[in-house]
Amino acid sequence: MGWAGVLLAAGCASPGGQPGEASGQAWSGRLSLRVDSEPVQTFSALFELRGVPQAGELILTSPIGNTLAQLHWAPGEALLKNGSQTRRFDSVDALIEAATGAVIPVGALFGWLAGREERVPGWRPDLSQVGAGRLQATRESPQPRADLRIVFERA
């Protein structure tokens, strides 16, 4: 299911979960993802990312504050909550791929947001603007190409 499917399935979900469920680092801001598939998929949302690569949560909300999806992960499990539905996956990578059509390297994302050069095959992060709260990363392979742009601040 692509982001459009997540959005349609999510509708106007209300927030759930407990604040601070995942300890570690925290960021918030806006993200956009473009996957050059056929047809092209685009998605943008406000986000809150908390935790560490091994266990954390990502909450996506619309500009007017409706929760679009909540992603929670821990070793061996990843959950996608949207509305009253919960879908389970074996890993956060499988969860992200099912939701977006592209594997976004969550482990590396934590490093990139912290300004660390984390190497991921096929991905090219641009960390030149991280100090100003901007990150861009492009996935060249495998196809389709994906472009991730994030404007963020530490939460």
Locations of the language-model features?
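Short polybasic amphipathic segments
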Residues: 31, 76-81, 133-138
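N-terminal export leaders
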Residues: 1-3
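Mature, soluble, non-transmembrane domains
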Residues: 13-14, 87-155
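Bacterial Sec signal peptide processing site at the extreme N-terminus
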Residues: 11-27
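Post-signal-peptide N-terminal segment of Sec-exported extracytoplasmic proteins
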Residues: 27-68
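Short, surface-exposed charged micro-motifs
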Residues: 46-48, 68-70, 77, 124-127, ...
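An acidic-aromatic
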Residues: 55-105
